[in-house]
Amino acid sequence: MVFDPRTLDQPKDISAYRDQRYQGSVRDQELALRTSCTLYVGNLSYYTKEDQVYELFGRAGDVRRVIMGLDRFKKTPCGFCFVEYYTREDAELALQNISNTRMDDRVIRADWDAGFVEGRQYGRGKHGGQVRDEYRKDYDPERGGYNRAIAQKSMVE
């Protein structure tokens, strides 16, 4: 398939993940996704360490850096990270072979990211973590138990 930048006016299926706060047009974001060497990795355990991510994703190629997602208030891990590779080819290999595998007994999700920008390592949820975790109703010990809103409500009752 040949890449044609003229086809970037509408979002395509290159990535299910979209940064809702991306500073630029849909076309700019789509171009960034198609040329990026960065992956967004989600559904990590809060206990997953940076060196574990390096070890797993390093199997696909040379990792430039790993940026662990942090709770905006506590500055503790909150279940996601960004993995930057030196080449698009290594990132593609990781996406094909590592996404939907297990790390710390969790199935991790990886998807293209338009590129890390300082500040994106912090969770955007109301309580500082990921928004996705605020809607979780089940108990998940690897991601802090119940979501914080449910935990606070049950403490009041």
Swiss-Prot record:
Sections of the chain in a coiled coil: none
Domain of life, source organism: Eukaryota
Residue ranges of domain RRM in the record: 37-115
GO cellular component terms listed in the entry, alphabetical order: nuclear cap binding complex; nucleus
Keywords: mRNA processing, mRNA splicing, Nucleus, RNA-binding, RNA-mediated gene silencing
Pfam assignment, any one: RRM_1
UniProt record, GO biological process: mRNA cis splicing, via spliceosome; mRNA splicing, via spliceosome; regulatory ncRNA-mediated gene silencing
Subunit structure: Component of the nuclear cap-binding complex (CBC), a heterodimer composed of ncbp-1 and ncbp-2 that interacts with m7GpppG-capped RNA.
Function recorded in the entry: Component of the cap-binding complex (CBC), which binds co-transcriptionally to the 5' cap of pre-mRNAs and is involved in various processes such as pre-mRNA splicing and RNA-mediated gene silencing (RNAi). The CBC complex is involved in miRNA-mediated RNA interference and is required for primary microRNAs (miRNAs) processing. In the CBC complex, ncbp-2 recognizes and binds capped RNAs (m7GpppG-capped RNA) but requires ncbp-1 to stabilize the movement of its N-terminal loop and lock the CBC into a high affinity cap-binding state with the cap structure.
Family, as annotated: Belongs to the RRM NCBP2 family.
Stored PANTHER family: 20 KD NUCLEAR CAP BINDING PROTEIN, NUCLEAR CAP-BINDING PROTEIN SUBUNIT 2
Name under which the protein is recorded: Nuclear cap-binding protein subunit 2
Species this protein is from: Caenorhabditis briggsae
